[in-house]
């Protein structure tokens, strides 16, 4: 264990971590070269990081090895965070350190002191097991605790972890979010951090979409929309706080054999398989309005319906076709705030022509029934993603 020093010699500011040393210790583990390398993270420059990739990059396992190294050398604990309390159940987290155990990293890091890990009531402890797997000795102190954003306010009065300095928020991007979930996450981080300046927040996800509440709140949405696999940069928020953002490119580390193996099983011309083969991110294809057929008559019913989401307006055109019947066409609205019509919003209405969610009443039900009946078209796949994300935030399904 290294000699403990504090930032500015002030214990309240937290332990002064030599991250270069920790990263050198990680390199000594000689992890496979084709998985994510956490030592490329600019940890001396930022306190927040967002790292996105497909499932095969080993992001979580790599940061959990950093977690073990921090505990060995500084007795620093880690908070492993998930969205909901259900996601933190032992049935879903007990295999979290399987890679560290099965590939011998626990013994590489701790030598003869410890050879295994066990989970007890959302706390991970180091231990020794005999040849039959029975725990014969265990550490009194936990090195990692499983936390949930959902229970943020409960932790305010019950959680005291002055040495918890690494927070790993796993699977941060999902299909559904709780109201004000980002605020709850920040509240949880504040409870853990207290007055420390040593805390690092690492956000990981196996889903890559710019339409996430978290990316929006972090000010990363516009960056994420333009980013492609392999991009990495430090982005400053409006208030000047730096955040590291990276989309890993799995292809850079895939060998010719791996690429060939993927194609031998998933060599189909379907873009939604891209994240499996590693050729690109998964792209959902949305229906685009077909070309008008000969003899078909299309009449616009209304252009006065809009969706407000991600600080943008989407126009919902309702058309009537002599061959297809009624349908909705979603397209960008290039102007500022629509002065007339109806605006559907996931925020508390602030204008006379704005309604929350999908609205109430027979008229609104008929409008959204077209969507439920798959009578919906989109000017682009990006437009489809935006509408999908808006409706998912309202828990509105077909």
Task: Name each model-derived stretch.
Residues 2-398:
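Phosphate/NTP-binding elements of NTP-utilizing enzymes
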